[in-house]
Design a protein with these regions (language model features):
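Ferredoxin-type iron-sulfur electron-transfer modules and their immediate structural context
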Residues: 1-61
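Short cysteine clusters
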Residues: 14-20, 24, 64-70, 74, ...
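Iron-sulfur (Fe-S) cluster-binding segments and ferredoxin-like electron-carrier domains
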Residues: 22-47, 76-93, 305-316, 322-323, ...
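Iron-sulfur-cluster electron-transfer modules
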Residues: 41-222, 226
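Conserved beta-strand elements of the Class I
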Residues: 138-139, 259, 331-332
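Short, conserved active-site entrance elements at the starts or edges of catalytic domains
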Residues: 139, 230-239
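Cofactor-cradling patches in redox/metallo enzymes
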Residues: 144-232, 267-362
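C-terminal amphipathic alpha-helical segment
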Residues: 235-283
Length: 362
């Protein structure tokens, strides 16, 4: 396997280091050392030394959620996410992806989303149709909201309607490239999706990115890949926080006590932590989880639930337990995928709300 020298250096530095193994949300959920960044690096180093074949470690490579908790915690600056994504790309180029990943990749290429979905729910179709006219601002919902959580996509639209914002929602959204980037890294196919989306976004003055996964991709990864977006790109939370600040979205604080679950894409990658809190504090009394802001613990997602659903359910259950342990009974999310993961856990001790639920009083 022909990894970059940078990746090899990081792999050899991580393979015998235990300092972040307690950070990994997947490792904590499985209880297996093999799920951690250290074990992943050890496996890659064995492939590099031709001791084992690349195909033998690929299940482990796809256990990484790329949340960057290990990277954030590393005092010496090593980056397991970087070498994990590079190995995924190499596996794709060498035709050594697991079958379950190949299926998701094929879906992305065929339908624009990893789930292979082509039809929207009737409610979402109607909500989109009401905003089909071209304006200066486009609300980009993303694949998870459109195909897996359409009820949340409708709520995201309703929030902007409540503020009397003039905006467009596309019936046929281009793929942002976020899912392909997760699955196969910086492949040509990933970049083509990104370039296509950037071209569509360029037809508007402002692009509001609902899903933090898409926000990270468009605002951070596009720059790394040399892709320019001519429009101004903003996260949904920063946009809504601005509406509240400008008095366009009326807020009534219910006094309900809640904790906020920071999406790592916002808090660690985009360094956006206060805007969602401004929204929450306008509608409720905000308390904090023990690990918050850049120290946040990932709570699961929809894409990985396609191939390791039991593990993702345990990841979400552990985050709910974090709230329960400090006697908090409501978690508010700003990521549709984390919301879905948390809501999927069968329990009755902690209520799961999205920011849209909080604003709309639902």
């Amino acid at each position: 396997m022909n990894l970059s020298e940078k990746a090899k250096q990081h792999v050899d530095s991580c393979r015998f280091c235990w300092m972040c193994h307690h950070i990994c949300p997947i490792g904590n959920a499985t209880g297996h050392e093999r799920s951690t960044a250290r074990a992943r690096a050890l496996g890659i180093s064995l492939v590099n030394r031709e001791a084992i074949d690349l195909s033998e470690i690929m299940d482990n490579i796809y256990e990484c959620c790329t949340c960057g908790g290990c990277v954030h915690d590393c005092t010496t600056g090593w980056d397991p996410v970087m070498f994990t994504k590079e190995v995924r790309l190499k596996a794709a180029l060498e035709n050594k992806l697991p079958d379950y990943i190949n299926k998701l990749v094929d879906n992305c290429l065929d339908t624009g989303n990893a789930y292979g979905e082509t039809e929207l729910s009737a409610d979402l179709k109607n909500a989109i149709a009401a905003h089909s006219e071209k304006t200066d601002t486009v609300l980009y919902l993303g694949a998870d909201a459109r195909y897996k959580m359409p009820c949340q996509a409708v709520k995201a639209i309703k929030v902007l309607e409540k503020a009397n914002v003039s905006f467009t929602v596309l019936e046929d959204e281009p793929a942002s490239g976020a899912q392909l980037d997760f699955l196969i890294g910086a492949a040509d196919e990933t970049k083509k999706q990104m370039e296509n989306a950037a071209q569509v976004f360029g037809g508007y003055k402002t692009v509001v990115l609902y899903d933090p996964t898409d926000a990270k991709t468009v605002k951070q990864l596009y720059k790394e890949y040399g892709i320019e977006v001519k429009a101004t790109t903003v996260t949904y939370t920063s946009f809504v926080a601005g509406l509240i600040k400008d008095g366009k979205l009326n807020a009534k604080n219910t006094g309900k006590t809640v904790v906020f679950q920071d999406p790592y894409q916002l808090s660690r990658d985009l360094e956006e932590t206060e805007e969602p809190r401004e929204i929450v504090k306008a509608f409720a009394e905000l308390h904090e989880l023990f690990l918050n802001r850049s120290e946040t613990v990932w709570a699961g997602n929809l894409l990985m639930a396609e191939y390791i659903p039991d593990v993702i359910a345990e990841v979400a259950a552990r985050r709910i337990f974090n709230a329960e342990s400090i006697k908090e009974s409501v978690i508010v999310t700003a990521c549709v995928s984390e919301y879905a993961a948390l809501k999927s856990v069968k329990q009755d001790k902690v209520e799961i709300l999205s920011i849209e639920d909080l604003i709309l009083g639902e």
